[in-house]
A protein has these predicted regions:
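Redox cofactor-anchoring modules in respiratory/redox and cofactor-processing assemblies
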Residues: 1-186
Length: 186
């Protein structure tokens, strides 16, 4: 709805001239993390994470290095810096294994703890589950507990295999979209 008046004034051709072959137009994104400028910003769908982080948001704060991009909010996933040239359109994001979700992303520097970021996402999804299906109701709690163990120094190498197994099981057996995406951050 944010673009309707501009499209009516300038025409559909004007709007379709923005974006790329995968998606036309623009999208409003919520930006956060260790970038100099956070907030809501509108971008052409062909814009990349790198362009947003460096050219629009002023780069990573305190001249640190980009460690990870968390795309798609709490049901989204993590991307390494090597994927920063990915365009912010639906298909390009799916190609690298993340969803657009709420059209948000956070860019974090090397001081961020990926385990803590994953715990936050899993904890949020655990609180939001309806509890109808066992994979979400029990599986998300088990995953959160394993992540707690790892972050508090009680983790074992076999916990990684258990986490992977739990994530795969939840992804395949959950009854709704929340369950299917609740473990993407892990």
């Amino acid at each position: 709805w944010a673009t309707v008046s501009a499209i009516l004034k300038k025409g559909s051709g004007w709007y379709a001239s923005m974006g790329n072959d995968n998606a036309k137009g623009t999208k409003v994104w919520a930006l956060s993390g260790n970038i100099k400028y956070n907030g809501l910003m509108e971008f052409d769908m062909s814009t990349t994470f790198h362009q947003v982080i460096e050219d629009v948001c002023g780069g990573i704060s305190k001249k640190k290095e980009l460690k990870i991009i968390h795309a798609g909010g709490v049901t989204g996933g993590f991307l390494p810096p090597s994927k920063a040239n990915t365009a912010l359109d639906y298909e390009s994001l799916l190609d690298v294994g993340v969803l657009m979700g709420q059209a948000s992303f956070a860019a974090y520097d090397e001081s961020a703890c990926v385990i803590d970021l994953a715990k936050f996402s899993v904890g949020f999804n655990e609180a939001e589950t309806c509890g109808k299906c066992t994979p979400c109701r029990i599986g998300l709690t088990l995953i959160k507990n394993k992540l707690d163990d790892i972050s508090e120094g009680r983790g074992k190498i076999e916990d990684l295999d258990k986490l992977q197994s739990l994530c795969e099981e939840i992804n395949v057996t959950a009854l709704c979209g929340l369950g299917e995406t609740a473990v993407k951050a892990v």
